[in-house]
C-alpha cells in the first residue's frame, strides 16, 4: 500500500494496522491517533467511564457542546452555525450508551505486538498545538513504539481541526508528506 491515514479514533486503528505488518505500507500519517492505555485494568475502566460521561454530557446539552466546540470556530465558512449545530446535536443523540462505551473502550484498549513489524514504513504523527497536552501520552507512546516516527505539531490547531475545518491546508500538508517521502525513497534507490 502506498499510503495510509488515520485520524482520531481512526488513528487508533492505524498503529495496530502498521504494527501487525500484514499489508506493507510505504508511508503513514497518524493524525492525533489514540494509542492504547498503559495502566491497570481498573484505571482503564475509570478512564472509559470518564470518556463515556463526557460524551454523554456533550450529547445531552447544547450549551456544553457549544462551550467545548464553539460554533464560530467549528463551522465551515458559508455555513449556518445554528443549522450545523442542530444537526450535530441531533446526530449525537443517536448513539446508545453501549455504542459510546464500546467506541471508547476499543479505541483505548487494543493490543499490539511487543515490537512492531519491520516494514520500512515512514510514519509521521500529527497533532494540533492546542491539543498537545491532551495527546501527551499518545505522543510518548508513538516515540517509544515507533522510534523512527516523525512528530509534527500543527500550529494553532485543536483536535481534528486541520482535516475538518481547513481541507485545503490538510491537502497541502498531506501531499507535502507524500511527495517528500517519495523523493527521499527515490534517493535511496
Spell out what each predicted region is.
Residues 39, 60-117:
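Conserved alpha/beta-hydrolase catalytic His-Asp/Glu region
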Residues 6-14:
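Gly/Ala-rich beta-loop-alpha elbow adjacent to hydrolase catalytic centers
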Residues 4-6, 31:
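Short beta-strand immediately N-terminal to the catalytic nucleophile in serine-hydrolase-like folds
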Residues 157-168:
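Catalytic histidine-centered segment of alpha/beta-hydrolase-like enzymes
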Residues 119, 125-127:
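Short beta-strand/loop motif that positions the catalytic acidic residue
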Residues 19-56:
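Flexible "cap/lid" loop of the alpha/beta hydrolase fold
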Residues 121, 135-143:
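Short alpha-helix in the alpha/beta-hydrolase fold that links the catalytic acid
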Amino acid at each position: 500500500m502506498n499510503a495510509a491515514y488515520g485520524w482520531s479514533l481512526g488513528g487508533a486503528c492505524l498503529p495496530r494496522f502498521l504494527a501487525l505488518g500484514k499489508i506493507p505500507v510505504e508511508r503513514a500519517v497518524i493524525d492525533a491517533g489514540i494509542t492504547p492505555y498503559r495502566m491497570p485494568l481498573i484505571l482503564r475502566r475509570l478512564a472509559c467511564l470518564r470518556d463515556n460521561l463526557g460524551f454523554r454530557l456533550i450529547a445531552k446539552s447544547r450549551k456544553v457542546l457549544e462551550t467545548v466546540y464553539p460554533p464560530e470556530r467549528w463551522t465551515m465558512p458559508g455555513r449556518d452555525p445554528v443549522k450545523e449545530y442542530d444537526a450535530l446535536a441531533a446526530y449525537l443523540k443517536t448513539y446508545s450508551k453501549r455504542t459510546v462505551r464500546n467506541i471508547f473502550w476499543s479505541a483505548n484498549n487494543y493490543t499490539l505486538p511487543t515490537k512492531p513489524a519491520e516494514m520500512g514504513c515512514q510514519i509521521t504523527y500529527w497533532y494540533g498545538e492546542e491539543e498537545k497536552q491532551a495527546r501527551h501520552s499518545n505522543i510518548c507512546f508513538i516515540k517509544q513504539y515507533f522510534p523512527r516516527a516523525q512528530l509534527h505539531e500543527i500550529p494553532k490547531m485543536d483536535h481534528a481541526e486541520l482535516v475538518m475545518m481547513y481541507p485545503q491546508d490538510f491537502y497541502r500538508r498531506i501531499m507535502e508528506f507524500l511527495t517528500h517521502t517519495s523523493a527521499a525513497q527515490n534517493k535511496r534507490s
